[in-house]
Swiss-Prot record:
Keywords: Antiviral defense, Cytokine, Glycoprotein, Growth regulation, Pyrrolidone carboxylic acid, Secreted, Signal. The keyword Cytoplasm does not apply. InterPro entries: 4_helix_cytokine-like_core, Interferon_gamma. GO terms for cellular component: extracellular space. Released primarily from activated T lymphocytes. Type II interferon produced by immune cells such as T-cells and NK cells that plays crucial roles in antimicrobial, antiviral, and antitumor responses by activating effector immune cells and enhancing antigen presentation. Primarily signals through the JAK-STAT pathway after interaction with its receptor IFNGR1 to affect gene regulation. Upon IFNG binding, IFNGR1 intracellular domain opens out to allow association of downstream signaling components JAK2, JAK1 and STAT1, leading to STAT1 activation, nuclear translocation and transcription of IFNG-regulated genes. The modification Pyrrolidone carboxylic acid is found at Q24. Residues 1-23 form the signal peptide. Homodimer. Interacts with IFNGR1 (via extracellular domain); this interaction promotes IFNGR1 dimerization. GO terms for biological process: adaptive immune response; defense response to virus; humoral immune response; positive regulation of biosynthetic process. It comes from the Eukaryota. It is found in: Secreted. This is Interferon gamma.
Length: 166
């Protein structure tokens, strides 16, 4: 389990490192700091294959990819939360978290707080379970694609109006 956390931290660093950053030099230094701390270059880290890389390859569509990325980001924030008392790597994790929020949540100031709230909701609390079930219909409706019916009707009416005036 310990090596899994190390490997995940390394993978996070690699994934974020390749996507570009405003402070790439510092970001890469923090990656190196984490790699050294977790001994991530050790051959045993690769045992069992990658955790997320293979999964991400299966998600081609950009909107679909965001779904799986949200789960991966959620995992990393939980990982960072478990390591929050480690002062040796705290600065590195803070920089990576900040960059992750910037990239994944498009720099919005409200979204990170909402995201943090969501990943901290306990699923074993009965009151939370009841609330979640109560909101399930609304959530499912939000997930459904919006109907283009109104847009089509407007377009058809506009087209008919042009034809009638010609």
């Amino acid at each position: 389990m310990k090596y899994t956390s190390y490997f995940l931290a390394l993978l996070l660093c690699v994934l974020l490192g390749f996507s570009g950053s405003y402070g790439q030099g510092q970001f890469f230094r923090e990656i190196e700091n984490l790699k050294e701390y977790f001994n991530a270059s050790s051959p045993d880290v690769a045992k069992g294959g990658p955790l997320f890389s293979e999964i991400l390859k299966n998600w081609k569509d950009e909107s679909d990819k965001k779904i799986i990325q949200s789960q991966i980001v959620s995992f990393y924030f939980k990982l960072f939360e478990n390591l929050k008392d480690n002062q040796v790597i705290q600065r590195s994790m803070d920089i990576i978290k900040q960059d992750m929020f910037q990239k994944f949540l498009n720099g919005s100031s409200e979204k990170p707080e909402d995201f943090k709230k969501l990943i901290q909701i306990p699923v074993d609390d009965l009151q939370i379970q009841r609330k979640a079930i109560n909101e399930l219909i609304k959530v499912m409706n939000d997930l459904s694609p919006k109907s283009n019916l109104r847009k089509r009707k407007r377009s058809q009416n506009l087209f008919r109006g042009r034809r009638a005036s010609m």
